[in-house]
Amino acid sequence: IVPFDYQQKIVGTIHKWLGNNEIHDKISLYSFSWLLGGNMIVDKGYNFSKGATLFISFYENKYLKVLIDTILSDPKMFCGLSVKEVTFEREPAFTEEPAFFRLATPIFIKRLIEENGKKEQKFYFYDDRESNDLMTETLKHKMREAGLPDDDTLKVEFDLSYMNKKKKLVTIHGIKNKASMCPVIIHGRPESKLFAWTVGLGNGTGISLGALL
């Protein structure tokens, strides 16, 4: 049985596979999903009797090579799970048309703001009007960090027509945060959409949040 708050175990496993390198100190140009394919057991956790799938994507291929080499020599994960097979997913072919994305993990948006002379963290969700601009701003910042050209047509927005959108409580490293489980629509150049699909959206993609399917 894998506990409900296993997400921090995935983070620890991926960092173990990556080893000691500068990726931990840089802005996260990678994203990864939670475990897919399990059955929930009430009050206990998840059962992966038929195995689980985990998606990991990096903008910089050198880290992918490090990850795969390490997995092959050390496939053990946690709670009795270990990697049995590594496969490569073909990159989607995007066009200039708006692209719709489902989420592999919820999108987490936060900013440090000053109110009444005091700085504090503010969190944003799919029903906050600022959220679309903040997701777009973060993605553009990551594109600049990656050395990609600016995309003035880039716009990220929550698909508010989705009926089952919700706010989800996520616990990582003992800290509880709420994030948005709601699909997104991305406008912009095909390269920008591919970049978003690779690195994820919002804050915390390096700790398993904001991964796209």
Regions found by a protein language model. Name each.
Residues I1-L213:
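RNA-interacting cores
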